[in-house]
Each structure stands twice: as C-alpha cells, then as structure tokens.
Amino acid sequence: MALNLRKNHQILKIINDALIDLPTPSNISTWWNFGSLLGICLITQIVTGLLLAMHYTADTNLAFSSVAHMCRDVQFGWLIRNLHANGASFFFICIYLHIGRGLYYGSYLNKETWNIGVILLLTLMATAFVGYVLPWGQMSFWGATVITNLFSAIPYIGQTLVEWAWGGFSVDNPTLTRFFALHFLLPFVIVGLTLVHLTFLHETGSNNPLGIPSDCDKIPFHPYYTIKDILGFVLMLSLLVSLALFSPNLLGDPENFTPANPLVTPPHIKPEWYFLFAYAILRSIPNKLGGVLALAASILVLFLTPLLHTSKLRSMTFRPLSQILFWTLVANVLILTWVGSQPVEHPFIIIGQLASFSYFTIILILFPLAAALENKLLKL
C-alpha cells in the first residue's frame, strides 16, 4: 500500500498536523478566526513591504521623494503603498480583537501561548513605530523624536541610551537608516514568534466559548475551519482593498504629506490611531518617568492576567458581572483612543486621567474581585 505523503513526509507532516488533521473544538465561533486573519495580515505586509523596499531609499534627503516616486511612477506603486499603510491598521484591528477574545474566554490560561502573544504584540508595535518613521514626513520625524525621547526618562542611563538609539544628538540620517533596517528585520522575527505561538497552542489545543475541555468532541480543522477561515480572509481583504482604493488616507495624518522639518513643530503631535490609547495613558501622568512607566504598564499588564484569574470558571460566558466589567473596559479603551487624539486641554486632561485610572483598576482589581464574588454567588 502506498504511503500517504501528507502524513509521512517530514515537512508535509508538520503542515498536516497544524492545518489539516488538527483536532479542533466543534463549537468555536468567529472570534477564533482572528488568529488566521493575523497570519494573512503578516503575509500581506511582508509581500507589499518587500515590493516597497525595492523602491525606497533610506536617506533623509531622498526618503520622502522616493515614496512620492513610488506613488507616481512605479506600476501600481500607489496601490502597494496604500495596501501596506492600511494593512497595518487591519493588523492592529485583528490583534486587538484577538486579545479581547482571549480575555473574554479565558484563553490566557494557556500561559505560554498567551505570553508569546503579548511579546508578539510588543514586537508588532515596535515594527509599526519604526515603519511610520520611514516616509520622513513631519509626523514621522516628530513622532520619532517624541517617542524615542521617552527613553531619556530612564534614570542614569536614559540620555546615553537615547543618543545611542539616534546615532547622534538628534533624529537624523543614522536614525532613519537603522529604523529601515529594523523595519525590514522585525516582521521576520514576528514570523518566528508566530511559529512558537502556534507550537505552544497545538500543545494544549484551542480553547472554546464554553471554556471547558473539549477532547471528547473534536473535529478535523480541514474542511470545517479552512472554509470558515477563507470566508474571513475574503471579508477582511475586501475591506482592506476597499479602504486602500476609496479612502486610503482616512486613517493617516495630513501632516505627513509635508516633508520632515526639524525647525517647525506640528501643532498636535500624535501617533497613528492604534497607539492612541497608550499615548493617552502616557499623557495623563504629569511626570515624565511616571508617564513612561504607565505607558509600559498599559501593555505589560497583559502578562499579569493569568495570575489574576480567581474564577473557577474559565470563560466569561456564564459570568455576568465579569461581562459587564469586560465591556466597560472595551468602552474605556475606546474613550482613551479618542482622548489621545485630542489636544492637551480641559476637559480632555481629566477625562484621560479618569480613563487611565479605570483601565488599570478594572484589569488589576475589579476583574479578580468580581470573579471571586461570582464564585460565591454561583456556590462554586
């Protein structure tokens, strides 16, 4: 009898065990689509990014012109650039929904998978930040200046660290060239981390909406979830292409159409929309070091969620108090995002401070308390 190549070939066997014969819970919902959507985002970004890198020049005198040249003179260069810029937004939409799913359904109890996921988020944020500097527009330059300057808040070594990162005494040509190198490298680091993420995930298997073990009721990934994922791909790519074709600058900052000028500061320096919630937390503390610590904590707090799980139920499906807190947290992050886009003046300052305070309070104090209370109420 001939061997089944798919199940016996060393490399095909790995693909088979991850994408074809993978035992998957029979009841996972569309919220479980975002992992594969993130994979598609990553592939799209690497392909479009590679095509852009072929025409880009990492030099302060030429960077802005090289991007303009791409959009005007390269075949479909405008489309590739628009797909790449808006693809980053979709990447963040998917990752935030993916993390929200993990928080709601208790997926963070797969600790290794969760921790690698948080590291992936940090790497993605670093990649997006260095990428935003490359077109060398006003917001690129000033964003790079403001955000890298935050490291100077680190006691004793801060200033040295910043000048080392800049490669000089201000953001200049050495900064741009190293940011381009990093922006090229980091997506491949993300690919490597993704494989580690999947390795740990397939060690335990996927969680499911009920948060209970589903070993007795597993179905093969293919064809059931391959077809479901393909529907997700089609929907997301349709949205991405629509945004890139109809309204490519909707999520960008008009300030970035002006070439970088160190002598003129833009009236409102703000990052891309996907960093605004963290930026609002940074601004809500009137002390530089305190703000930087709060900024770091806003993401690093995710490492603590598995340790703060006090409920005897894994998922929030049957926990109404935790559900109310969860959706309050979602609304809170949206408020932070809005405040981050507003100027630093009354009433935005106090709104930002209240929203920042409640962000940490919900995650660190109210979630564990509500879960403990629910254990009592449900007599668990």
Swiss-Prot record:
PANTHER family: CYTOCHROME B (PTHR19271:SF16). Component of the ubiquinol-cytochrome c reductase complex (complex III or cytochrome b-c1 complex) that is part of the mitochondrial respiratory chain. The b-c1 complex mediates electron transfer from ubiquinol to cytochrome c. Contributes to the generation of a proton gradient across the mitochondrial membrane that is then used for ATP synthesis. This is Cytochrome b. It comes from the Eukaryota. Coiled coil: none annotated. Heme b b566 binds at H98, H197. Binds 2 heme b groups non-covalently. It holds the Pfam family Cytochrom_B_C. Gene3D superfamilies: Cytochrome Bc1 Complex, Chain C. The chain crosses the membrane at residues 34-54, 78-99, 114-134, 179-199, 227-247, 289-309, 321-341, 348-368. A ubiquinone binds at H202. The keyword Heme applies. Belongs to the cytochrome b family. Its cofactor is heme b.
